[in-house]
Amino acid sequence: MLETNNHTNAWQGFKTGRWNKNIDVREFIQLNYSLYEGDDEFLEGPTKATETLWDQVMQLSKEERERGGMWDMDTKVASTITSHDAGYLDKDLEKVVGVQTEKPFKRSMQPFGGIRMAKAACEAYGYELDPETEKIFTEYRKTHNQGVFDAYSREMLNCRKAGIITGLPDAYGRGRIIGDYRRVALYGVDFLMEQKLKDFNTMSTEMSEDVIRLREELSEQYRSLQDLKELGQKYGFDISRPATNFKEAVQWLYLAYLAAIKEQNGAAMSLGRTSTFLDIYAERDLQNGDITEQEVQEIIDHFIMKLRIVKFARTPEYNELFSGDPTWVTESIGGVGIDGRPMVTKNSFRFLHSLDNLGPAPEPNLTVLWSTRLPENFKIYCAKMSIKTSSIQYENDDLMRESYGDDYGIACCVSAMKIGKQMQFFGARANLAKALLYAINGGKDEKSGKQVGPSYEGIKSDVLDYDEVFERYEKMMDWLAGVYINSLNIIHYMHDKYSYERLEMALHDTEIIRTMATGIAGLSVAADSLSAIKYAQVKPIRNEEGLVTDFEIEGDFPKYGNNDSRVDEIAVDLVERFMTKLRSHKTYRNSEHTMSVLTITSNVVYGKKTGNTPDGRKAGEPFAPGANPMHGRDQKGALSSLSSVAKIPYDCCKDGISNTFSIVPKSLGKEEVDQNKNLTSMLDGYAMQHGHHLNINVFNRETLIDAMEHPEEYPQLTIRVSGYAVNFIKLTREQQLDVISRTFHESM
């Protein structure tokens, strides 16, 4: 048992229980955290060292922009946990150290997901991949991407090309796995290795395929922990043992996360739920007089600074889907325990306070687990920081706690999972709007004219009949669900085989829950289109080949986003219906089906891939992001828009329901105190309506227009998009225009 070793002084002053005999971080937190219900008066400003380091980061960021988005990159060394020497911003000033290569801002080369992707990322920025490295990963070491395309069917390839399924993680790391990085700080690496060895030695001796695979995975996990210790040694730390103070706890935890991002470039490399855990160490050191509040904030600021400069080399195609260089270093803050105690600590404030000390930023993806039972002072502080920075997203803890307990985190944007006990197979999105066009055209693509879906006679009537359209739409969704799940099964089989997340999984229990995280795009377009067909008169317009390529609408129809049950119920039905169809298909590793209504910035790409739709949206125009109403159609004010989105049922969308909400400051009130109060009331109301997620932007449209014209004046302008935050000036002009075209609510 761990308590018999020589490191018990690391836990001096902590309340003990099961956690000091077996891995149980949740119990450690519940026994030892200190609820804070006070205000923000205790917070400290940035130290001189913090300001100096942040100036250095801003200078490097400026140089990166001037170099076309890439400061430097490795073109020869495949990144692993131990591949590069230690790197620093300023070793004498940094309180938390460690970067992905030997230099900050130098991006690593990660070929295990796909050598073609790695090569394309190099060439996109004027670099050349080392020929010997390319040869190794082409001729001798197969990659995830190669494996997937070896197994894809022609039907899957056609769907991918047409964009009825797109954004699939078949050419990039899947991500969305959260290692329990807290375990390294609490237990030290040696104990974690002992536990993995114990699990390996007590496994079934009946060598089925599942057992053999798990034995190999455990061996890889064990080796990754050895590498993690070596990484610690490179920076002068012995992380084989538990952390003994707050500074070590932050450093140990960060090194574990650093190891993960050195080894994987997943689309979302989320951090978990660390602030309350780390606060336990801070409170102990403060009580003992070993540290000051200013020193605690400085360490947090330096930790946040490191999370802000996480970088991966991406291809232009990837950047179209996930624009603005996001990494989704998502940190989940707050929430309420299953015993009813809020889990807000002083560290909850300190993490958000970094937005003052360092200025606004998109990373880490600061996510407040909102509950109506959070302390009022914390609610007000969150509202104040949202209005000031537009850098925070909110997710309904009262909704998620029922399914995930009180030690879950958010992966990527809106996907809840129990930390260290659950992972997901990320599945991008199926295009429900395009599927509706396939139903009308008998499986033919409205843009290319090719037969992509199942072949049957297209609709021939001069006016679309709702019942006829829906009957065919249902069949098309049946087909789409099948090809979608089967594509994901191939992708995740190959990812486990060729690009396994061994370190992240080493920081999980050996027996875990897996989910198959599907998603849908174009929900509001599909719902409004069906509403138009049902309540107005929609005439299809055909080209010379008889393909429906446009629509003429006579009359008005209910539009999603106005709290009108006639169309909102269509949206709800689509979500429930498609989820039922997905569940009818077997998943890889018996993972549980989940679904998201989330698009990231790929709503622009989906729009490009989709022709004219029966709701009046023109070919190529962006979809609304996530579960949002289409731009400008939610005309009855903020609360009606929120009410429509809140109707989407979380029970069949447990991978998350993203809602991005923009409001002008004056609509929240004239005075700051009124604005803060009104925003907290709005969040409480949305939570009570069972709304899941809310990105909040508070600014005027004119600010964004000026930033487009004068980007140099807005280096830290941060906005929330579908599920994450981004530096506005890093978006493409097309995506900037899409953001500006969205609804800015001027009334509640």
Swiss-Prot record:
Homodimer. The modification Glycine radical is found at residue 723. It comes from the Bacteria. InterPro entries: Auton_GlycylRad_Cofactor, Form_AcTrfase, Form_AcTrfase_GR_CS, Gly_radical, PFL_dom. This is Formate acetyltransferase. Pfam families: Gly_radical (PF01228), PFL-like (PF02901). It comes from Staphylococcus epidermidis (strain ATCC 35984 / DSM 28319 / BCRC 17069 / CCUG 31568 / BM 3577 / RP62A). Residues 625-748 form the Glycine radical domain. Belongs to the glycyl radical enzyme (GRE) family. PFL subfamily. The lineage of its organism: Bacteria, Bacillati, Bacillota, Bacilli, Bacillales. Signal peptide: none annotated. Residues 5-618 form the PFL domain. GO terms for molecular function: formate C-acetyltransferase activity. One of its GO terms (biological process) is glucose metabolic process. Pathway: Fermentation; pyruvate fermentation; formate from pyruvate: step 1/1. It catalyses: formate + acetyl-CoA = pyruvate + CoA. It is found in: Cytoplasm. Keywords: Acyltransferase, Carbohydrate metabolism, Cytoplasm, Glucose metabolism, Organic radical, Transferase. PANTHER family: FORMATE ACETYLTRANSFERASE, FORMATE ACETYLTRANSFERASE 1. GO terms for cellular component: cytosol. The active site is at residues 412-413. Catalyzes the conversion of pyruvate to formate and acetyl-CoA. Its EC number is 2.3.1.54. Several mechanisms have been proposed based on complexes formed with substrate analogs. After activation by the glycine radical, the cysteine radical, Cys-413, can abstract hydrogen atoms from the other active site cysteine, Cys-412, and from coenzyme A, and it can also transfer hydrogen atoms to product radicals. The other active site cysteine can attack the central carbonyl of pyruvate and covalently bind the product acetyl group. PROSITE patterns: GLY_RADICAL_1, GLY_RADICAL_2, PFL.
